């Protein structure tokens, strides 16, 4: 299991959900509080995610991984 630290996901960071990348699209972190990250994804809207349960990958602002 990959350890992910909540501090990596600051507001404004762009991410993709590794398992749902094509379905959800690119997301932008809105907040990260108490091991919960709120992200607004382009295809499915706002999701609140526990980074210990969902693998997220940080991407650059142009959307390339």
Residue ranges and their predicted role:
Residues 1, 45-65:
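Intrinsically disordered, low-complexity, charged/polar segments
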Residues 1-15, 23, 63:
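Mixed-charge, Lys/Arg-rich low-complexity intrinsically disordered regions
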Residues 2-6, 33, 56:
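Hydrophobic transmembrane signal anchors and adjacent membrane-proximal interface regions, especially
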Residues 9-11, 32-35:
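A short, compositionally biased
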Residues 16-17, 45:
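N-terminal non-cleavable signal-anchor helices
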Residues 24-32:
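Short beta-strand-centered aromatic/proline hotspots
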Residues 37-42:
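SH3/SH3-like beta-barrel fold
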């Amino acid at each position: 299991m990959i350890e992910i630290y909540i501090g990596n996901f600051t507001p404004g960071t762009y991410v993709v959900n590794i398992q749902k990348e094509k379905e959800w699209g690119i997301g932008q972190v809105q907040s990260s509080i108490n091991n919960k990250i709120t992200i607004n994804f382009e295809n499915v809207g706002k999701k609140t995610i526990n980074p210990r349960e969902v693998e997220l990958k940080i991407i650059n602002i142009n959307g390339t991984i």
